[in-house]
From Swiss-Prot:
Activity regulation comment: Phosphorylation triggers an intra-molecular protein closure, which blocks the FHA binding site and interaction with target enzymes, and switches off the regulatory function of GarA.
Positions where Phosphothreonine occurs in the chain: T21, T22
Outcome when changing S95A: Decreases ability to bind to and regulate the activities of Gdh and GltB, but does not affect ability to inhibit Kgd
Source organism of this protein record: Mycobacterium tuberculosis (strain ATCC 25618 / H37Rv)
Protein name: Glycogen accumulation regulator GarA
One Pfam entry name: FHA
Amino acid sequence: MTDMNPDIEKDQTSDEVTVETTSVFRADFLSELDAPAQAGTESAVSGVEGLPPGSALLVVKRGPNAGSRFLLDQAITSAGRHPDSDIFLDDVTVSRRHAEFRLENNEFNVVDVGSLNGTYVNREPVDSAVLANGDEVQIGKFRLVFLTGPKQGEDDGSTGGP
């Protein structure tokens, strides 16, 4: 009897077959995969007007939970891999206690609290930085966009009359 597939090796002592797969993707296909994260950021930008005065929003642009939103409405908001963090970022690239977002003198600061991989604002490493609307904060593999609402005491443009 002749073997029909001479190129395939068979282990005579086992019925296991090993199959390996290689995937190749077009660059435009990969950019389509990023589209939902970008769309989520755009919808968050349009919803920023509804934020309470003195608060801000962090939107995950890249990372395992892209599109997630975190409201910054406390004096200090912690971010890290520890389950007790206000912003829980579950990935090994994030330290247990990675960074804090602090509201001081009507502006938000991000402070690295001794993380292993560092905290970045607009791709620059920082120990502490004042955040401006649209800044990108990187914590581990997560990239978050910082969006501000109206500042405390600012008029939102609405009138009190009919």
